[in-house]
């Protein structure tokens, strides 16, 4: 327990919470270029795809590619948002479908917003 004199000399510092998406530098999204597109190693290899993305903020991150099927390859320009994937350790970002080089998911009827699909014509 510090003395009153010690507290006057240097006040208590508030505990700062660490950001979960440091690579975005406080922005809601960041643009980046795919360095490599691959499947995660065993035991998470299932049918999931991830990409190493070099962001405009200078970070190189691992981002999840949501939805069924994608057109991403090396040098594709993508938009990245925060949001972790529970069963893939170290994957704390997601690629936004339907923007830049990442096309929307085909034949998607429900939950379209997450996958960049426009409202179908009646």
Curated annotation (Swiss-Prot):
Q: Which Gene3D superfamilies match?
A: Nucleic acid-binding proteins
Enumerate the subcellular locations listed in this protein's record, separating them with semicolons: Plastid, Chloroplast
Source organism superkingdom: Eukaryota
| Alphabetical keyword list | Chloroplast, Plastid, Ribonucleoprotein, Ribosomal protein, RNA-binding, rRNA-binding
Query: What CDD domains is this protein classified in?
Result: Ribosomal_S12
A biological process term (GO) from this entry: translation
Which PROSITE patterns does the record match to this protein? RIBOSOMAL_S12
UniProt keyword Plastid present: yes
GO terms of molecular function: rRNA binding; structural constituent of ribosome
GO CC list: chloroplast; ribosome; small ribosomal subunit
Family matches, as InterPro entries: NA-bd_OB-fold (IPR012340), Ribosomal_uS12 (IPR006032), Ribosomal_uS12_bac (IPR005679)
NCBIfam families, alphabetized: rpsL_bact (TIGR00981)
General function of this protein: With S4 and S5 plays an important role in translational accuracy. Located at the interface of the 30S and 50S subunits.
Family in the record: Belongs to the universal ribosomal protein uS12 family.
Quaternary structure and interacting proteins, as annotated:
Part of the 30S ribosomal subunit.
Show the PANTHER family listed in the entry: 30S RIBOSOMAL PROTEIN S12 FAMILY MEMBER
Could you identify this protein by its name? Small ribosomal subunit protein uS12cz/uS12cy
């Amino acid at each position: 327990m510090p003395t009153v004199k010690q507290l006057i000399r240097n006040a208590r510092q508030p505990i700062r919470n660490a950001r979960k998406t440091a690579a975005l530098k406080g922005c809601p999204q960041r643009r980046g270029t795919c360095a490599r597109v691959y499947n995660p190693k065993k035991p998470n290899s299932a049918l999931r795809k991830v990409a190493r993305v070099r962001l405009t903020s200078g970070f190189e991150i691992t981002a999840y590619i949501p939805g069924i099927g994608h057109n991403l390859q090396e040098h594709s320009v993508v938009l990245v948002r925060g949001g972790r994937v529970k069963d893939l350790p170290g994957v704390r970002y997601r690629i936004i479908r339907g923007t830049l080089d990442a096309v929307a998911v085909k034949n998607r009827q429900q939950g379209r917003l997450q996958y960049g699909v426009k409202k179908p014509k009646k």
